[in-house]
Regions:
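N-terminal Sec-pathway targeting helices
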Residues: 4-23
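Membrane-interface motif at the C-terminal end of an N-terminal transmembrane signal
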Residues: 25-40
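Boundary/entry segment of secreted carbohydrate-active catalytic domains
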Residues: 36-92, 97
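Aromatic-lined substrate-binding rim segments of carbohydrate-active enzymes
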Residues: 77-137, 152, 211
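The substrate-binding groove and active-site-proximal loops of carbohydrate-active enzymes
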Residues: 99-111, 140-151, 180-192
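An active-site-proximal structural segment forming one wall of the substrate-binding cleft
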Residues: 111-129, 146-173, 194-206
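Active-site groove signature of glycoside hydrolases
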Residues: 131-141, 160-193
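Catalytic-core regions of glycoside hydrolase
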Residues: 173-184, 188-310
Length: 310
């Protein structure tokens, strides 16, 4: 019996010692934390509401500037670009439209390519992210000014792609596939399904993956990639970088032809059809969690009054 009590007392003493050590250790930690925190100093500051513009990257309003490329020397647009950069000081997005109509039936000259590179270089030294659009028309007359052959459009894509890729850190997204009135992918020799798809996929293969691409309508995107299933787009690293630029935004109930009337509908089997406004917006809600969506508000009307636009 005595041996049992001795062992029991010994065990109690061990447990007590463990608790004592733990308590002492806890006290030491508290002292250390107190000493550490007491060495930190800070200066309090008052805060007040402000209505200043928040220049968040890659979103918000953009300024739009255009260049008609020629065979003149590389620094032809230096003064104009400097003026543009000064004018757009309050925004962080700019849409640069590069008009190639002077070369609509020939390759771009070395001087022309040097001009384009110089323009991008100057903008890359500014705090702006660039939305880029190549085009052949500013007057709604693309059928008269775009190349007579699709091969010339493809040549221009190849010629400009290296320059674009070398400025991928400042070029955020490209709009369109070079063709159509205002490069908005309508009123063109090359907007049949075959030609449109050929140009879009060529551009996709040429442009660095770090730069987003975009097409004018959801119908265009579905037609190019032959699916209305966004989960299929998610499985393809190249396809998922293609967003939308809605240049008919709030111009009418169907955004000036972006959507169809209420009886329009697309399906998995008829992916190349145009849907009504509700169906297309639901499609965009899912797609544009993954890629950018932007565009231009046009035509003053009741749909872009503040109550409706909100």
């Amino acid at each position: 019996m005595k041996t049992f009590r001795t062992k029991k007392n010994y065990l109690i003493r061990i447990i007590a010692a463990i608790f004592t050590v733990a308590a002492v250790f806890s006290v030491l930690i508290c002292f250390a934390l107190h000493f550490y925190n007491s060495s930190i100093s800070y200066t309090s500051s008052g805060f007040a509401p402000a209505n200043d513009i928040l220049n968040n990257p890659y979103c918000g309003w953009y300024d739009m500037f255009g260049y008609t490329i020629s065979d003149a020397c590389a620094d032809t647009f230096d003064k104009r670009t400097q003026d543009y950069i000064q004018k757009s000081g309050s925004t962080r997005l700019v849409l640069l439209e590069i008009n190639l109509k002077n070369f609509n039936n020939t390759e771009l000259s070395d001087n022309a390519l040097a001009q384009i590179d110089r323009i991008f270089t100057m903008w890359s030294e500014s705090p702006h992210a660039v939305i880029l659009r190549f085009l052949y028309d500013w007057d709604g007359k693309a059928m008269q000014t775009e190349p007579d052959s699709i091969e010339t459009v493809k040549l221009h894509m190849r010629q400009t792609s290296d320059i674009v890729n070398s400025h991928k850190n400042s070029i955020y997204i490209m709009q369109g596939i070079f063709v159509g009135s205002f490069a908005e992918m309508h009123s063109s020799h090359y907007m049949d399904t075959s030609s449109m798809t050929e140009l879009a996929l060529l551009l996709d293969s040429l442009i660095d993956d770090d730069i987003y691409l975009s097409v004018r309508t959801p119908q265009h995107l579905r037609t190019i990639f032959k699916t209305a299933d966004i989960s299929k787009l998610k499985s393809d690293g190249h396809r998922i970088r293609m967003g939308l630029f809605n240049d008919g935004m709030l111009g009418s109930y169907i955004d000036v032809g972006t959507y169809g009337p209420e009886n329009y509908h697309f399906s998995d089997e008829e992916y190349d059809k145009k849907g009504n406004r509700s169906q297309e917006i639901a499609f965009q809600d899912e797609l544009c969690l993954l890629v950018p969506n932007g565009g231009e508000v046009v035509l003053d009307n009741k749909y872009n009054d503040i109550d409706n636009a909100a």
